[in-house]
From Swiss-Prot:
Keywords: Carbohydrate metabolism, Cellulose degradation, Glycoprotein, Glycosidase, Hydrolase, Polysaccharide degradation, Secreted. It is found in: Secreted. It comes from the Eukaryota. This is Probable beta-glucosidase O. Gene3D superfamilies: Galactose-binding domain-like (2.60.120.260), Glycoside hydrolase family 3 C-terminal domain (3.40.50.1700), Glycoside hydrolase, family 3, N-terminal domain (3.20.20.300), Immunoglobulins (2.60.40.10). Pathway: Glycan metabolism; cellulose degradation. InterPro entries: Cellulose_deg_GH3, Fn3-like, Glyco_hydro_3_C, Glyco_hydro_3_C_sf, Glyco_hydro_3_N, Glyco_hydro_3_N_sf, Glycoside_hydrolase_SF, Ig-like_fold.
Amino acid sequence: MTVLAPWALWEKTKDVMVLEQQYQSMCTWIAAIPENMKRHRHLCDPVVLQFAVAVRESNPWAVMTAYHKINGVHCSEDPRLIRDIPRSEWKYDGLVLCDWWGIYSTSELINAGMDLEMPGPTDWRCKILAWATRSRKVSIETIDSSVRRVLKLVNRVLAAQSEPVKDSDTEKNRALLRETTAVPVVLLKKNEANVLPLVKDSKTRYALIGDHWKNPAVAGDDSSEVTPYYVSTPYSAFVEAVGEDSFICAMGCYSHKFAPLLYSTITQPGSDAHGMLLEFFNKDPNGSSDAELLYTTTTEKTDLKFADSLPPDTVPEYTSSGSAPSRGSRWGCAGWIREAVEIARQVDIPVILTGLSADYEYEGIDRKSLGLPGRVDELIERVTEANPKTIIITEAGTATTMPWADKTPTVIHSWFGRQETGHGIVDILFGDVNPSGRLPLTFPRNLEVPPVYESDPKHIMTISVSLKNTGQCPGAEIVQVYVKDVSSSVQRPRKELKSFKKVHLAPGENMKIEVTS
């Protein structure tokens, strides 16, 4: 989370510097913190720049370190990330605090410049810090520097509390939010069917397909969850633009998280036959029932943290965060998809609005796949086949795969637009705002496309080749791997030997050889 200047006056720049994985990020009590291996150049060029802009231009009051390690050192105790880069290079004079329970030492933290342990009461200071001072691992001068920065933040907050609260829900701010929602929208695929911009007349008939028209994704969840003054839905904004008589609505299918759909992998009890066993009870009970209570709740939101493991013979049954602890399967979608297809044939231009939501994008979790939820991909393919002028709009804060992209003429990607989501999307559709945004991340064609060799802690890449002995005698061969840096800034050989492997093959033998570099 980076607060980009000049929009930040009092915000903390969170998670310095690199956090590419949220899975187990809160498990600070076990040795399961993810570790990122970053070369210094890779760290400084694409990663540090975004934080440098926020710190230099907006001068935030505090920055926060991430949980994990970079090249073997925890971010919260890395002097390069806390002292050398922000304070020496950027001249940052504010506070540095850790993410909740995100520290793992005492003297290393203080000496690196970590000022504040969160939350309180502290676990790694007090008596431990006193012993570190007595043993001369931490100097009094270093502690005094951190104390001054903490007091500086306290004085800043006290001064801000005395100022009157200003009403931010003004017409000027609404117009600004509307603009900042529409401008970053990305036109992923050109207007091949020449349907954009849409026209505001009574002759053109539209179909609004997808659950995001009336229930849009306005923001993520957890730490990014903020209650807005209002929410402009795309449906209401479309009504403002052309009226209710110019379009037909269709659900198509849900993209929000519910019980899983009934797929062919579900089998009947006690057999391998596909389907489910249903039991209907049409008789009213005569008296009180001794039926088992399946589910009860007293809160709307609960977090469960497990710091232990289950016995090997125990099958765990639980649900992910944000879901009610109930089990079952969901029927439907097939009829809604058929309805959407029929409606798409009847209108001039169908517009599908779907994507992810706060059900899938929130702090402390990774998505299990890059695909769109449920049967959304099927909905898009079938509607596009029924009407080639279909416009696809996806809402998401992260990348999604689009297996239907080659079959659709127009693809638009909208980010989470907060309270002006609806107006921002409709402004793009009718040409009031040009979709001039660009992707800050890669949208892979499928999950197999992104290279994963750089994710290996040792930066290992394996190359596979097939080798066959076509002769009549046993033989040996050395497989060699040469590389060439096509964009090196310094003079290097045209070919560099990086790895080799010697193999022995019998006559006619065909072998698959893996060479690791």
